[in-house]
């Protein structure tokens, strides 16, 4: 069940997604939170603008992937297993695998892979990999989402990204 604290972290992830969009990247944001509800690390999509805003495009700079990498280098096995990743969009297959290989815990997301695929179809946008859900990649992982009230905002970000036409969000 998604709690009020979960929603707070998801709102931060959505804010990071908006930051990514404003910077010129696809709108995705993620937050890594410890078992005692402390925000450990945040990131946004940087696939176009580069790790340091240097413009060196890197298709692996998804926020879920960079948080998994950060956690692997900075947290113990136990800390990683007890952590939660909050994200504006369900992990892709690459990020799901990184999450599992690094031994991270629960994932809570705003919009699902299924939703993203429907939105992409609406605008004729493709993807280079199969649209797998997290649990298709990591069957035993605890995953919660989508969160419809926030997914509407994320949808608007994607529309703006794909069309260049912004919609005014009330959230």
Question: Where on the chain are the PLM-derived regions?
Answer:
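A short, polar/charged loop-to-alpha-helix boundary motif
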Residues: 48-65
């Amino acid at each position: 069940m998604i709690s009020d604290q979960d929603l707070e972290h998801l709102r931060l992830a959505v804010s990071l997604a908006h930051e990514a969009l404003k910077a010129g990247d696809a709108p995705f944001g993620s937050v890594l939170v410890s078992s005692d509800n402390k925000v450990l690390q945040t990131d946004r999509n940087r696939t176009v603008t580069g790790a340091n805003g240097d413009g060196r495009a890197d298709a692996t700079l998804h926020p879920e992937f960079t948080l998994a990498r950060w956690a692997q280098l900075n947290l113990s096995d136990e800390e990683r297993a007890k952590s939660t990743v909050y994200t504006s969009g369900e992990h892709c297959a690459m990020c799901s695998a990184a999450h599992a290989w690094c031994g991270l815990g629960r994932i809570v997301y705003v919009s699902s892979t299924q939703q993203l695929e429907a939105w992409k179809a609406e605008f004729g946008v493709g993807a280079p990999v199969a649209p797998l859900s997290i649990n298709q990649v990591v069957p035993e992982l605890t995953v919660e989402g989508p969160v419809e009230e926030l997914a509407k905002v994320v949808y608007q970000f994607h529309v703006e990204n794909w069309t260049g036409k912004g919609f005014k969000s009330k959230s």
